[in-house]
């Protein structure tokens, strides 16, 4: 197996070779089951780096326990300005203490592990998340229900998985803290060919609006069966709805609280076109990695101008213009702006919705 200490230094950019050039460390899988995701990270970050004149240091992320120390050694030795990627929580546990000593921020594009972030805040590790926290999802869902579903009979349904139960529990707690008690809380059996019994149970209870914490296919089956039973349910799912529209197509008008497709953002239109022109489809982690590289370049300038460590500037809430819009971090090192938005399925794609009601 190739040593994790092996670095690939990419030069030849506009400002590459300059002693003062900022540099970005790209930590992402180069082989194995996550190679495709790692390729998306590299494509996005390197495209932005070429445009911005960043030197690039690529390090393989094996996602194995105990691999973070060697990765940290490589990043520190290369004196990168910022390290981005980190698709695996296993990497971060050991990589963060050395990066703290070197004042190198680590920006993860995917890790949502709450315990890791708790440790990072406790020990002052420079971990920042472009991936939204689980709390951000439940907060936005509860906010929308409180705004749009007051006066209706509300049902909350989970699929029995830990993630779904915890999501629905957080939503219910937030609703009840704000004086809105759901009429029904239920657990469904996922991965079934039909959900007629659940749909009829909701109807008997008088439920008109229901949030379903389940995979997209399960929600699609509920919507299909509600339609066949002529039961007018307003259905809303969470971030799990951002998935392939098969094997059961999702009915039009089903709602979801999820992140918009990055390439549909107004701030991303030009870059998405440039990437497609270069043969790179702006999907998955491509645009988040591009944004992380933009943030790296702007942060390097701010660090020099303010004579402050980069992690301190990030933790201070400074906003940076990126392909994903203005990005900054709150004191918990999460995104300061909740990226989840209410969307409605139009039969082909999700589109922004102003209100969580059927049309």
Report each predicted region and the residues it spans.
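Extracytosolic ligand-binding ectodomains
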Residues: 2-10, 21-359
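N-terminal signal peptide c-region/cleavage motif recognized by signal peptidases
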Residues: 16-19
